[in-house]
């Protein structure tokens, strides 16, 4: 029996081989115990403040929304140590692993940000680290591969399937099934089998808690909408969690539209997928009529995932959150626009959320909107990818 509810409505669960059930139940018990231990909470908070650099600022853009009455704020997770929101929950899970007596950490990564965050946490806490990464993503994200190795992690390229994040996830789970006695699988997003979606949300929810308090201080009211990109869904659930009960605040998740939904080359299971079981959970996923997982696509490695966390599936099904898609081109335009107008280079993942916020502001220029975009990471890792695209298209003006 689980201690916590493994489902969000009909979504979630523990659809894993029997061999992994004891490991998941052990993890759940350790998490519940840790959440009730003031010493654990204090150590986690100290690491977030003194090592990671929380709280992160809520920055009002000065130039981006000129010509509209929108006040657009950026929640600056890009300023966190490690360069993205990933550091938050990685520190929490790594502390949990030490508490459980584990000596090794297994992780998967797409854009490399989760791998970097895991490597830095393992270096800090004295844990061995191995990271599975799709071979295609290793090519797309060479700077992050080097960062991981520099901090002592072993990076294992995965050549099976589409050589991307879903394949890295499968290999990491296989490894954990054989080594969970001394290893913890440090999952990088709010997806997968219970208790991972709950653990990751709880270790990310300070994003929304801070943003809410900061918005009250600056605007003396709640925002009209909070907007975040959605791959597996950790940065979005971190932003949404504290606003779920504030029904007047729109929760908008932005999935990768890739080359356009009609092309079939996208990563938008919530908007254009169907229900099924994948990666240990029941959620929405991209699958064919035979139930075979279809390959997702996005210019952004961190959003290139064919499913989504179960809490997002639930929020979509009850109408509490809305999920839209943004194409590669729209995200690349927003990437360049933020850099030129504010001097901030965002991650390609975050650029999807930014692009939708700009659409909202410009579609109703006379409306006095207060919008918060979760700028989930910085764009250093993406500059070579973007430079190649801009060079081919001749679009760097």
Curated annotation (Swiss-Prot):
Q: Record's Gene3D superfamilies?
A: 3.40.50.1100
Which cofactors? Answer: pyridoxal 5'-phosphate
Keyword set, alphabetical order: Amino-acid biosynthesis, Aromatic amino acid biosynthesis, Lyase, Pyridoxal phosphate, Tryptophan biosynthesis
Q: Which InterPro entries match?
A: Trp_synth_b_CS (IPR006653), Trp_synth_beta (IPR006654), Trp_synth_beta/beta-like (IPR023026), TrpB-like_PALP (IPR001926), TrpB-like_PALP_sf (IPR036052)
Q: Which GO terms describe its molecular function?
A: tryptophan synthase activity
UniProt keyword annotation of Amino-acid biosynthesis present: yes
Identify which top EC class this enzyme belongs to. lyase
Q: Which reaction is the catalytic activity of this chain?
A: (1S,2R)-1-C-(indol-3-yl)glycerol 3-phosphate + L-serine = D-glyceraldehyde 3-phosphate + L-tryptophan + H2O
Task: Output the Pfam families linked to this UniProt entry.
Answer: PALP (PF00291)
- What pathway, per the record? Amino-acid biosynthesis; L-tryptophan biosynthesis; L-tryptophan from chorismate: step 5/5
Q: List the SUPFAM superfamilies.
A: Tryptophan synthase beta subunit-like PLP-dependent enzymes (SSF53686)
- Give the Enzyme Commission number: 4.2.1.20
Task: Identify one Gene Ontology CC term for this UniProt entry.
Answer: cytoplasm
The N6-(pyridoxal phosphate)lysine modification is found at 86
Is Translocase among the key words of this record? no
Q: Briefly, what is this protein's role? A: The beta subunit is responsible for the synthesis of L-tryptophan from indole and L-serine.
Which PANTHER family does the UniProt record give?
A: TRYPTOPHAN SYNTHASE, TRYPTOPHAN SYNTHASE-RELATED
Q: How does it assemble?
A: Tetramer of two alpha and two beta chains.
Identify its protein family: Belongs to the TrpB family.
Q: What is the name of this protein?
A: Tryptophan synthase beta chain
- Which species is this UniProt entry from? Aeromonas salmonicida (strain A449)
- What lineage is this protein's organism placed in? Bacteria, Pseudomonadati, Pseudomonadota, Gammaproteobacteria, Aeromonadales
């Amino acid at each position: 029996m689980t201690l916590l509810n493994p489902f969000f409505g009909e979504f979630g669960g523990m659809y894993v081989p029997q061999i992994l059930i004891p490991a998941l139940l052990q993890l759940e018990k350790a998490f519940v115990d840790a959440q009730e231990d003031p010493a654990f909470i204090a150590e986690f908070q100290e690491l977030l403040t003194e090592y990671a650099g929380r709280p992160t600022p809520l920055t009002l853009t000065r130039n981006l929304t000129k010509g509209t009455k929108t006040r657009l704020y950026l929640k600056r997770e890009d300023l966190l140590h490690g360069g993205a929101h990933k550091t938050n929950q990685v520190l929490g899970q790594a502390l949990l692993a030490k508490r459980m007596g584990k000596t090794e950490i297994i992780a998967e990564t797409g854009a490399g940000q989760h791998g970097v965050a895991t490597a830095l946490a393992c270096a800090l806490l004295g844990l061995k680290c191995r990271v599975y990464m799709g071979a295609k993503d290793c090519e797309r994200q060479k700077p992050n591969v080097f960062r991981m190795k520099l901090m002592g992690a072993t990076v294992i390229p995965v050549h099976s399937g589409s050589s991307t994040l879903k394949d890295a996830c499968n290999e990491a789970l296989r490894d954990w099934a054989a080594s969970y006695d001394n290893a913890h699988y440090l999952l990088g997003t709010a997806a997968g089998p219970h208790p991972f979606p709950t653990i990751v949300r709880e270790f990310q929810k300070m994003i929304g808690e801070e943003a809410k308090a900061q918005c009250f201080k600056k605007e003396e009211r709640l925002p009209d909408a909070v907007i975040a990109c959605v791959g597996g869904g950790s940065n979005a659930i971190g932003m949404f969690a504290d606003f779920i009960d504030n029904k007047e605040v729109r929760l908008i998740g932005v999935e990768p539209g890739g080359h356009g939904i009609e092309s079939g080359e996208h990563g938008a299971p919530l908007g254009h997928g169907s229900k099924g079981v994948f990666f240990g959970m029941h959620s929405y996923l991209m699958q064919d009529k035979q139930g075979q997982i279809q390959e997702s696509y996005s210019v952004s490695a961190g959003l290139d995932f064919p499913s989504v966390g179960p809490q997002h599936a639930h929020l979509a099904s009850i109408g509490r959150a809305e999920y839209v898609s943004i194409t590669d081109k729209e995200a690349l335009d927003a990437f360049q626009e933020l850099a030129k107008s504010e001097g901030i280079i965002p991650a390609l993942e975050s650029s999807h959320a930014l692009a939708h916020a700009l659409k909202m502001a410009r579609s109703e220029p006379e409306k006095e909107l207060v919008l918060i975009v979760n700028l989930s990471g910085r764009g250093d890792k993406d500059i070579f990818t973007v430079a190649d695209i801009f060079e081919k298209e001749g679009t760097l003006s």
